[in-house]
């Protein structure tokens, strides 16, 4: 997504007339740079509010390994808003039928309705996150770990098990502050 699309996303999100949990899910994806499917099937027991962490089990991850993600103050605020809507259930974003969780397609349709440009989907948040973080000098290992990418160097992957939580916590808070500024000022 371009800077203009980020600005437009927040303009459109303010006027979004769909289900409030859809809007909150899109915010969660933007703030954490997670994959849409990871947000769609998120469960309340994966979130640790005291330590501000989201622990996703390997079975739910593309790379099939556990993933821990720090939570920014803005993500905590999104989750607290969401608790009033879906906090009594298992899933953050339950399916409208009451069975299981929402589908990533619902999120894609919501973004399509925002007319952000051809091919703009919830997954597109990962590109501006990575680009912004790299351009602003954050450690590449922290960026890749946050994106839950698998290390391509097999030897390095075998030995390097660092989670870089402190660095990623700073990175995600700075990213969230950047997005909040974009939302508040209309510029990114």
Where are these regions (language model features)?
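Catalytic-site neighborhood detector that most strongly recognizes the C-terminal catalytic loop/helix
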Residues: 56-64, 76, 99, 147-182
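Short alpha-helical segment immediately N-terminal to, or the first helix within
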Residues: 28-29, 132-136, 146
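Hydrophobic, well-ordered secondary-structure elements that form the walls
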Residues: 71, 130-133, 143, 159, ...
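Residues in the recognition helix of alpha-helical DNA-binding motifs
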Residues: 42, 110, 146
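Conserved tyrosine-mediated DNA breakage-rejoining catalytic core shared by Y-recombinases
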Residues: 10, 37, 41-84, 150-157
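Active-site/catalytic core of tyrosine-dependent DNA strand-transfer enzymes
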Residues: 1-8, 51, 70-119, 124, ...
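Short, polar N-cap/turn motifs at the start of nucleic acid-interacting alpha helices
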Residues: 46-53, 117-119, 138-158, 181-187
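Basic, Lys/Arg- and aromatic-enriched nucleic-acid-binding interface segment
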Residues: 1-42, 50, 61-65, 85-86, ...
